[in-house]
């Protein structure tokens, strides 16, 4: 099995599955000198390469290049894609590609991967990859189409980004009138709200940031034309500008 891209997502997946497979090869110039072309005998690959947002559009050029190389080396290879890609771009990829959205945090990626409760597999290869990861305990495997899998990823991240922006904007506007920590501890008791994404970040700054929320929110606005999310982006920018 090839791990193509060994950032925090690829590494978490690769290290977790490595003890359960015959051979694990890392393909990433920052971590090894291995090349895809030298592993035509590989039957499967996990792809976790960057998909930055450029001018509001998800740049999937690295994915397209990697998938092209993998299929050139072995036309029958099974590919598990973990990089975030909008549905319209995802559907242009070959049927070999099964989409498996990740919900890992950069600081706790290995722990998050080991403790995930839902494992989404979008595409024709879902049954194959469920067998590959069948050693995982306490996980619900959900097989669906690639578009639905991609929508789950984007709606998950943009919903949480919106939650951050909402709570932080209210704090900025009227935070002097209430006890914020007490407020969120009370609201966290409501199951339909939950405890996450209400507090300030570790440095006390306002607005969402990090590896995923900014790029995913912009890309999803480009894909959907959502006016609500466009407003969230504008509000978040103001929050960040006012706390730098």
Labelled PLM ranges:
Residues 19-20, 92-98, 109-196, 223-229, ...:
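Internal alpha-helical scaffold of NAD(P)-dependent oxidoreductase catalytic cores
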Residues 1-44:
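NAD(P)+-binding Rossmann beta1-loop-alpha1 motif at the extreme N-terminus of oxidoreductases
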Residues 44, 52-109:
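Rossmann-like NAD(P)(H) cofactor-binding subdomain of soluble oxidoreductases
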Residues 105-106, 157-161, 191-193, 203-217:
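Glycine-rich phosphate/pyrophosphate-binding beta-alpha loops
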Residues 1, 21-27, 77, 96-97, ...:
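Hydrophobic anchor at the start of a short beta-strand
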Residues 216-244:
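C-terminal active-site/capping subdomain that shapes the small-molecule cofactor and substrate pocket
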Residues 44-48, 120:
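Structural motif
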């Amino acid at each position: 099995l090839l791990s193509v891209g060994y950032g925090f997502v690829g590494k978490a997946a690769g290290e977790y599955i490595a003890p359960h497979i015959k051979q694990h090869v890392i393909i990433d110039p920052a971590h090894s000198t291995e090349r895809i072309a030298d592993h035509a005998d590989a039957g499967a690959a996990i792809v976790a390469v960057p998909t930055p947002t450029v001018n509001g559009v998800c740049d999937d050029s690295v994915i397209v290049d990697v998938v092209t190389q993998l299929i050139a080396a072995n036309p029958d290879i099974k590919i598990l894609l973990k990089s975030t890609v909008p549905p319209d771009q995802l559907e242009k990829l070959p049927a070999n590609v099964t989409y498996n959205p990740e919900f890992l945090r950069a600081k706790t990626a290995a722990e998050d991967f080991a403790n995930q409760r839902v494992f989404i597999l979008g595409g024709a290869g879902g049954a194959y990859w469920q067998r590959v990861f069948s050693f995982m305990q306490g996980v619900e495997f959900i097989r669906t189409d690639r578009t639905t899998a991609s929508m789950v990823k984007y709606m998950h991240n943009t919903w949480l980004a919106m939650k951050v922006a909402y709570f932080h904007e209210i704090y900025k506007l009227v935070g002097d009138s209430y006890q914020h920590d007490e407020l969120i501890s009370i609201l966290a008791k409501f199951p339909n709200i939950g405890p996450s994404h209400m507090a300030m970040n570790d440095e006390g700054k306002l607005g969402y940031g990090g590896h995923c929320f900014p790029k995913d929110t912009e890309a999803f606005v480009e894909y959907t034309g959502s006016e609500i999310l466009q407003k969230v982006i504008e509000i978040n920018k103001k929050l960040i500008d006012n706390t730098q």
